[in-house]
């Protein structure tokens, strides 16, 4: 956060993902920028970062206006990731279908492209572009 940029008011990468979100009716939420980059490298472009471990009300409103019907929660397998998952679930479970893929690593950003293709993509059931 800074005087001119408040992370809780934005979703990282939304400007790149918005057309893919509308096309697939699915938004994939990850914690950080590195996670967004890694998923893009694996061909999953309807993903955005929440800048940390909790979803703000402003970010929730952005998701509600994104055209998504499904929210994929793809946070890390550490304590912060579990906190983020709970925050997202609390704000989105009554408004969206929720998908929570499982993966073997701790950090999404540390996975190889091959691991994402093998472990994550099949669980998305074609809800990516």
Locations of regions flagged by a protein language model:
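Phosphate-handling DNA/RNA-contact segment within nucleic-acid enzymes
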Residues: 1-66, 84
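Acidic beta-strand-to-loop metal/phosphate-binding motif
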Residues: 29, 66-80
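Short, aromatic/basic amphipathic alpha-helical patches
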Residues: 83-93
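A generic structural motif
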Residues: 97-107
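Short, small/acidic-rich helices and loops at N termini and domain boundaries
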Residues: 19-23, 107-129
């Amino acid at each position: 956060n800074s005087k001119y940029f408040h992370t809780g008011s934005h979703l990282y990468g939304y400007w790149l993902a918005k057309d893919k979100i509308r096309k697939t009716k699915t938004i994939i939420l990850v914690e950080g920028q590195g996670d967004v980059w890694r998923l893009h490298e694996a061909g999953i472009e309807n993903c955005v970062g929440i800048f940390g471990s909790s979803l703000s009300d402003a970010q929730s409103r952005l998701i509600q206006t994104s055209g998504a019907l499904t929210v994929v929660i793809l946070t890390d397998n550490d304590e912060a990731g579990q906190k983020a998952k709970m925050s997202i679930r609390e704000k989105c479970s009554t408004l969206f279908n929720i998908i929570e893929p499982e993966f073997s690593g701790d950090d999404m950003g540390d996975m190889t492209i091959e691991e994402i293709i093998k472990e994550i993509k099949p669980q998305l059931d074609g809800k990516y572009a």
